[in-house]
Amino acid sequence: MDAEVEDKTLHTLSKGTEVPMDSLIPELRVPYDCSMAKKRRAEEQASGVPINKRKSLLMKPRHYSPDMGCKESPDNRNEDDGLLETNDHATADEIMVKSMDETLHLPAQDSSLQKKDQYTCYPELMVKSLVHLGKFEESESVQTTCENLNGSSIQSLKAESDEAHEGSMVHSDNGRDKVHHSQPPFCSSGDSESDSDSAENGWGNGSNSSEDTDTHKGPKHKLTYNRKDLLEVPEIKAEDDKFIPCENRCDSDTDGRDPQNSHMEPLVVKAQPSFPEVEEGESLATVTEEPAEVEKAKGNLSLLEQAIALQAERGSVFHHTYKELDRFFLDHLARERRQPRVTDANGRQIFTNKHSPRPERREAKCPIPGCDGTGHVTGLYPHHRSLSGCPHKVRVPLEILAMHENVLKCPTPGCTGRGHVNSNRNTHRSLSGCPIAAAEKLAMTQDKSQLDSSQTGQCPEQAHRVNLVKQIEFNFRSHAITSPRASASKEQEKFGKVPFDYASFDAQVFGKRPLLQTGQGQKAPPFPESKHFSNPVKFPNGLPSAGAHTQSTVRASSYGHGQYSEDTHIAAAAAILNLSTRCREATDILSNKPQSLRAKGAEIEVDENGTLDLSMKKNRIHDKSIPPTSSPTTITTPSSSPFNASSLLVNAAFYQALSDQEGWNVPINYSKSHGKTEEEKEKDPVNFLENLEEKKFAGEASIPSPKPKLHTRDLKKELITCPTPGCDGSGHVTGNYASHRSVSGCPLADKTLKSLMAANSQELKCPTPGCDGSGHVTGNYASHRSLSGCPRARKGGIKMTPTKEEKEDSELRCPVIGCDGQGHISGKYTSHRTASGCPLAAKRQKENPLNGAPLSWKLNKQELPHCPLPGCNGLGHVNNVFVTHRSLSGCPLNAQAIKKVKVSEELMTIKLKATGGIDGDEEIRHLDEEIKELNESNLKIEADMMKLQTQITSMESNLKTIEEENKLIEQSNESLLKELAGLSQALISSLADIQLPQMGPINEQNFEAYVNTLTDMYSNLEQDYSPECKALLESIKQAVKGIHV
């Protein structure tokens, strides 16, 4: 791509250069022949890797535009123009160092390759044209003309470069899209900076000296400026070609030609009349020959050659860097777009990221160019393979951000990130920790084994459809199940690991019977009239699915990554809005094995101990009592999608059928199931209404129509709901609504179980006629089953014993019809109020054809217990559950009645006291006076207390002041004592040598006496002392002078 751009640039830029090609060919092997460009071209030919231009443009920064010929911003181009201008004004000293032979030396061995050279870039052509122009000036015929042209060209180049610089600044202010005439063909920001530095270091002084030289020699060389003549000179045309706008460089006629021939022919044609026109021009002044000017021009040309060659080499390095970035981003895109390709279910394999080749370790790095991994959110460079946590994300174009959006998603279609092993959606970029992917993998393995062992074929009328056609044979009154354990275990393996349908489990266990609904857009295909459907077969309790929004179809295996249909979101919204009231769609699950599993009614039994049985092992199917039918009925229905074992929604009826055979530990045969005929179902009093309803919609509900497949995400939303009715997931033990799929940690499960126990257990009443359970010794109506603690049983001191007729009441006898109480396990007739210990009930249970109908005594248990208080409808109870309220303890109406009774008792006591004369007027007055006196005395005492408190506070303040004064006095005394001790020691030391008459030497023992004697002597100075005494006093004065008080 870069080679094509260079050829086009060479082709368009070399059209206006007037240089004779015959003279340029000997100079093509100059040392500055752009070796880096040839090396890059050789590497491209060796690699031969095509680069997608669209992807490479997306990966490159915004300022990079290869279709414009690798043009840079106007600022960089201005710097390069300044470089060219600086090169034109070189110093005279450097020009004198380089000779003409050194600059234009050409080896003789390169003459054989003159005609085979190609011009790889425009700077190479510019260098060779300028070099040839220097050689042209050696000839004596045009020596004077060339000297004049050199001086004028330098001045004109300086003026034009200044004009171009000003023009480029104006265009850059207007905008980037405006093209100005100062753009060089190859430049980069790094090149401009380095060239400007080199110009400042090496040629900065030369520009100044050249300007000074031209200024001094201006009067000597007076040339007339003619624009037309300057444009016809080859040197000027070669320099002015850089300033031609890009719009004039593209020629439609020359684009189809060879790049070499297209620029060689106009050069030869235009170069011939150039110098005759210059010689004929009479506007040029004749000056004397000066070799210094020629050498100066040669030095300028050599410096210009070096600058252009350096710029070409750096431009090649710049394009090589972009080429590496293109390859890196192509590899990264190829790695990111390896997503799981899911094929059709007809036998093709599934390719996921697990089977795709693992990328190399060195490629697991940040995709942002120039990012070394520091400052990432993850803090670990090898694990950062996306743009989400990179601090340099703002510098990435929007196209790259759009390409890397899929990295942040789970690759499993329909997965929202819930239930992952690492519980983080952003870090989940593979199928390893996704529960939906694991379920699909299991489904594929089961589907493969299922397709191998399948015995059913496609329906001939629907053979053109892609989806498979299943056949289900519903055999009513068929033979008993006698399949061996090997085949039964093989069938059990197929249906062992399937998702459980909690919605239908709620419908079966908790007694919810929503209306039969079908999904929108589902239409049952009409049945063809046949003998098989003359007597239509109805399925009393088919396997219901989780609802219309969770149809028993998994998404197709060929569903591509990133496809999210609208019905997925609609179904998800329906699943969220329909958590509390789940709709049951009575559809029969289609499989490749003929089967029809029946679900029984919503009877939950409570045994004699009050324990709720949730094992679903009641009403076991005994095939011995079911007579076989003569001709089975077969229904062939087209399935909407290839059926997998994982798409089977297992509800309570399915597990009942599993448990009703021989228990959970025995293999079960799924090949056939048994049902009832219409006559038996119509005789059944419980399921009669349900059968009538299902007669109308049996065909519509049992055959799902071909509907667009729903994602397993909708199925998952239904499965993660709490099975407790009315539970929104709050208050669970686990603290996570999504992980709560059982009743074990639900706070509402206890209330629900209590309500079920109360709904299915017999009402426990007090046997005393007219007793509502209030006032019992135990305080609990439910535990009161005898007359021992009943207050009404001993009313009036009469012992009320139940009569024979009362014992035979329906509440006290066995609920089994025909049982007289004999043979019970408890051995006591009166305490036998359930069918658990009745031998007749066990016998009838064994003989009963298990058709899903409850026993006769179980029908009597369906009556719900009610509040015993007359007029109470169950509202406002303490436990907020009417079903479990069987006493007056939590009834609000009873509480109001009790309050009224207490108030009436208090009024009665007041009335009795008033009538007894206790509350007389005189006594009340006397008591009032005493109370007044007490109040007055209390006020006086309070006033005295206030006075005492004020006195106490004043005394306390005085005491504090006295204590502070004492502290000050003590401190002054201590200081005085210290000072006295110091003075005494000083006096003793000073008077140690002086001895008073009649006294010994001074010391601490006689210090006071010594001081007293001295005071007496000094106080009686008026007396006449002997000269000895006066001398002694003088000596004492001299000794005491050193003491300072």
UniProtKB/Swiss-Prot annotation:
Keyword Lyase: no
Presence of keyword Metal-binding: yes
Residues the record lists as binding Zn(2+) 3: C722, C727, H740, C746
Residues that coordinate or bind Zn(2+) 5: C814, C819, H832, C838
Pfam annotation, one family: zf-C2HC
Start and end residues of each stretch annotated as Disordered: 38-90, 158-228, 340-364
Positions of Zn(2+) 2 binding: C410, C415, H428, C434
Superkingdom to which the source organism belongs: Eukaryota
Matching SUPFAM superfamilies: CCHHC domain
Biological process, per Gene Ontology: interleukin-1-mediated signaling pathway; interleukin-6-mediated signaling pathway; negative regulation of cell population proliferation; positive regulation of transcription by RNA polymerase II; tumor necrosis factor-mediated signaling pathway
Keywords: Coiled coil, DNA-binding, Metal-binding, Nucleus, Repeat, Repressor, Transcription, Transcription regulation, Zinc, Zinc-finger
Residues reported to bind Zn(2+) 4: C766, C771, H784, C790
Any GO CC annotation of this UniProt entry: protein-DNA complex
Molecular-function GO terms, alphabetical: RNA polymerase II cis-regulatory region sequence-specific DNA binding; zinc ion binding
InterPro entries xref list: Myelin_TF, Znf_C2H2C, Znf_C2H2C_sf
Positions that bind Zn(2+) 1: C366, C371, H384, C390
Coiled coil ranges: 918-987
Protein task: Repressor that binds to DNA sequences containing a bipartite element consisting of a direct repeat of the sequence 5'-AAAGTTT-3' separated by 2-9 nucleotides. Represses basal transcription activity from target promoters.
Family statement drawn from the similarity comment of this UniProt entry: Belongs to the MYT1 family.
Protein name, UniProt field: Suppression of tumorigenicity 18 protein
